[in-house]
Amino acid sequence: MSNADQHMDVDEDEYLYGETIEERNDGVTVSNAKSPEQASEESDDSDIEFIIETKPGERAEPLGGSIATLGSTRPSAKPQVEKTAVEVKTTEPQDLSTAETAPKVDIDAVPTIDGKNIFEIDLESFDDKPWRKPGADISDYFNYGFDEFTWAAYCAKQTTLRDDFSPQKFMASLAQIPGPLPSGNVPSPAEFQAMMASGFPPFMPIPPPIGGPQEDMGYSRNFPVHASSNYNTTHTSGGGVHSGAATPNAYVNNNPSSSRRESESPANSPNITSSAGMTHAQPTHNPTSSYGNGASTNYNASRPPSNHPHSSNYPSSSRRKPSPDRYSNYSSRGSGGRYRRNRY
């Protein structure tokens, strides 16, 4: 490689990478060089001496040693804190019976004003009614949201309740109940509360059972029955069913016989006929039946007999005429369904 090539390489390196490390160090050395003026000032500062005057007979110690002794000194021991003992006094339990008790407030007591019950005071008796004056605050005279009218209604209600439901009246009503009392006298309110808490009071009668037999309830019959036996009935040749019934005259407390009950049944109505005869028997009535005062009246049947003959194509229990359905058969509305089709 020739010198020209080496020079070109050096120039390229300088162009690409800048100055070398040696050249930089030389530049730093040159830049750090001190001027003679600065060197003279530093020498002047180092020539300053500190002189400390001491008294005769004392030895001056260097400043460095004194600083070291001050820095090395430490407290030898921590200061002791004096602890004061607290004496605990034990109090002996006092007898509660002898101790003074604060006065109790009876919340059920009725307040009084000038010795008069507050519920008995009439507001109209006050000549000067300050709560009616304009600008007056009604809460200064009536508490709990009351006003003049609601307070009067409340007083009337409280007076009525206290008069009707007083303990004295209740205990007096208990004394009138038949039966032996537990102690022979009217029980005190405390005894009465104890008895009510334990169950039904033993001196009160037990009520009769609900839904029990009527003989136990004091009844001698189950339902009213007829006093007379004036039943004029006729029998048909086909069915042999009773076709008439008489009007009841009076009611007594005797139990009816089975024959009377059968004759009074709805099946023995004069309008119902047997399936064999298909004829109606005209009932005969007793026009001389009387009610209490002996006045004779005529009895009219509530439902006249039918003059139309019945067909035997359907049961006698149904009077609805059969209607043909789309299968050209007859259907009846019976127990078999609403529209029963007799297809077969």
From Swiss-Prot:
GO biological processes: co-transcriptional mRNA 3'-end processing, cleavage and polyadenylation pathway; nuclear mRNA surveillance of mRNA 3'-end processing; pericentric heterochromatin formation
Biased composition (Acidic residues): 39-50
Pfam families associated with the record: Fip1
S-S bridge residues: none
Biased composition (Basic and acidic residues): 80-92
Disordered as annotated region, ranges: 1-99, 230-344
Cellular component aspect of the GO annotation: chromatin; heterochromatin island; mRNA cleavage and polyadenylation specificity factor complex; nuclear exosome focus; nucleus
Compartment list: Nucleus
InterPro entries xref list: Fip1_dom, Pre-mRNA_3'-end_processing_reg
Compositionally biased residues, Polar residues: 28-38, 271-301
Lineage: superkingdom: Eukaryota
UniProt keyword list: mRNA processing, Nucleus
Low complexity bias: start-end ranges: 243-258, 302-317
Family designation: Belongs to the FIP1 family.
Known role: Pre-mRNA polyadenylation factor that directly interacts with poly(A) polymerase.
PANTHER family (alphabetical): FIP1-LIKE 1 PROTEIN, PRE-MRNA 3'-END-PROCESSING FACTOR FIP1
Protein name in UniProt: Pre-mRNA polyadenylation factor fip1
